[in-house]
Design a protein with these regions (language model features):
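Active-site loop/lid in soluble adenylation, ligation, and acyl-transfer enzymes
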Residues: 11-114
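Short, Lys/Arg-enriched N-terminal segments with co-localized hydrophobic residues
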Residues: 1-7
Length: 114
């Protein structure tokens, strides 16, 4: 994966246009790589997310989270306690844990030291 990342960072800037059926995470990653910016966990990538894509990213992460729950052998269909857990966890990560990653940074206001 590190080799792939290094290879993509050195790739030409003219990456393919957004294809129908391509996961939104791939589209966002392509934009970040094309700009030759890093995307570590604490980096803000909001400038590379187009309007409406965060909702699609939530759907994508929900699907991935559901596969994690399935791999953990958790019955999310018949256990009312775990229904919609994949969506709740995905939402928690995107809108709470990593909120500063996907939204524009607020304006910084300086106050004089009194």
């Amino acid at each position: 994966m590190i080799f792939l990342h290094q290879m993509l960072m050195n790739a030409p800037v003219n990456l393919p246009s957004e294809d129908i059926g391509t996961p939104v995470s791939v589209k966002i990653r392509e934009r970040v790589l094309a700009a030759r910016k890093r995307f570590h966990a604490n980096d803000n990538i909001a400038e590379f997310i187009q309007p409406g894509e965060l909702d699609h990213l939530l759907d994508e992460v929900t699907e991935k989270m559901q596969t994690v729950l399935d791999s953990m052998v958790i019955d999310t269909e018949n256990d009312h306690n775990t229904q919609d857990t994949a969506r709740r966890v995905a939402k928690m990560y995107l809108k709470e844990v990593f909120k500063g990653r996907y939204t524009e940074s607020p304006e910084v206001t300086e106050f004089p030291n009194a």
